[in-house]
Amino acid sequence: MFTTLHSTVRALALGTLAGIALLAAGCSKNPSTDQIGSGDMSAGKADAPITVVEYASVACPICARMNQAAMPQFMAKYVDTGKVHYIYRPMMTGNQQVSVAGHLLAQCAGPDKAFKVVDAIMRSQEEMDQGGPPEQYTNARPVLTRIAQSVGLSEDQFNKCVTDPKGIQVMNEAHDKAIKDGVDGTPTFFINGKKIPLQKYDISDLDNAIQPLLKK
C-alpha cells in the first residue's frame, strides 16, 4: 500500500501555508531516473556502483513509516560506505501544501541539512495532524517553523522560502519529472534504473534488491 498520485490534477494549494502553487502534468514512459535534477537531493559517492532513487513526500504516511524503518540503516550500510549513490526526488502526494512547503524548506536548508529536514518533517506528521481531520496537518505551520529554526532559518526566511516562485517552479518540474518516469505513488524506489517492489516497507526491501548487485 502506498500513497497514490493523481497525475491529471492541476491544483492551487492555499490556506495554512498560503501562496504555494502545485502543478501536475500528464504521464509518459521515458524514464530518466539516474539523471540529477534541480529539485533532487543526493547523498553518497556520485560514482558508486549502485544508484538508488527514491520518490517520496514528506506528507506521505507510508514514506514516513519507511523513513523510520529503513533509511537510517540504509544510509549507514550502503551510502556512508560508498556502495550507493542515493537520490531523493520530491513528490506531492499526501497534503499538497505541507509537501511543497516541506520540500522547499529542505532545499533552503542547504545540502548539508536537507535530509535532516526531510527526516524531521516525516517524524512530525502526527504532531502536524493534531487538532484537525486526519492528514490535513492543521498544525503544520508552527511545526515547520520550528524545524526551520532548528537548521538556522528565521521565521521570515522560512516564509520567503516556501513562497519563492523560483523554488515552486523547481518543485513543479520535479513533480513533472517523476510522472514522466512512470511514478504513480509514494514511496517508489528505482535501483540502477529498475523499479523495485516494496513488500514490508523496511530495510529488507532494499537489502533484497541491493545485495545481489553487490555480488556481481
Q: Which sequence ranges carry the predicted segments?
A:
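Functionally engaged cysteine thiol sites
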Residues: 47, 108, 161-164
